[in-house]
Amino acid sequence: MSGHSKWNNIQGRKNAQDSKRSKVFQKLAREIFVAAKKGPDPNLNPSLRLVMDKAKAVNMPNDNIKRAIDKAAGNTSGENYDEVTYEGYAPGGIAVLVHALTDNKNRTSTNVRVAFNKNGGSLGETGSVSYMFDRKGYLVILREGLDVDEEEFMLEAIEAGADDVEVSEDVFEIFTDPATFPEVKEALQEAGYTFATAELSMFPTVYNEVAENNQTQFDKMLEALEDDDDVQEVYTNAEIN
């Protein structure tokens, strides 16, 4: 996966996301609420444990996390969210996957369609672009202050069950099969490593470059989608420079 570091992409968008931290926490609270409805104990509910780790990685306050779990445990109002995935193309044929948690599918569908249409994109049918992505476990370990040989670490990660390891100056990126993700994560934690990111994510099988004349519309479309309260994640196969 050399040359397509997801971590570089995360860092490239970090400043914009930091300015919207309250919205990030709001979306994570919804994700925690949905996961916690399957059980409030993260030791018995892997889905909840995963999203809690995700929340802690962005410094979401523990009180916020607990409040979302308690809300799910005491939910008597019938509040419920459906998981919905939208697929389409951004300007220049860039594939886009949008994952949402919504209590009103009509509202979310309309908002997503407007975000595509207003910015030169087109919303497609189910399956139109999802085949271009693979679901993988994804772990990031910051190298700052870490005294470990690159080859030694790669061997350690592979022995723990990782499928692939990408090494850069700043980070180790570990990729796993979704089914083995918890075991790999636990093995590396027991070896003393901590994670800047630990999640299941979608990765393109082929990357496409965003043409210079499409960049502004592409950025506006992503911003419109990410600003929507119902949208949890936006994945693209845009080339990361």
From Swiss-Prot:
GO terms for biological process: regulation of DNA-templated transcription. Pfam families: TACO1_YebC_N (PF20772), Transcrip_reg (PF01709). Its main location: cytoplasm. The keyword Electron transport does not apply. GO terms for molecular function: DNA binding. It comes from the Bacteria. It is found in: Cytoplasm. GO terms for cellular component: cytosol. Residues 1-14 have a biased composition (Polar residues). Residues 1-22 are annotated as: Disordered. NCBIfam families: PRK00110.1 (NF001030), PRK12378.1 (NF009044), YebC/PmpR family DNA-binding transcriptional regulator (TIGR01033). Belongs to the TACO1 family. This is Probable transcriptional regulatory protein LMOf2365_1554.
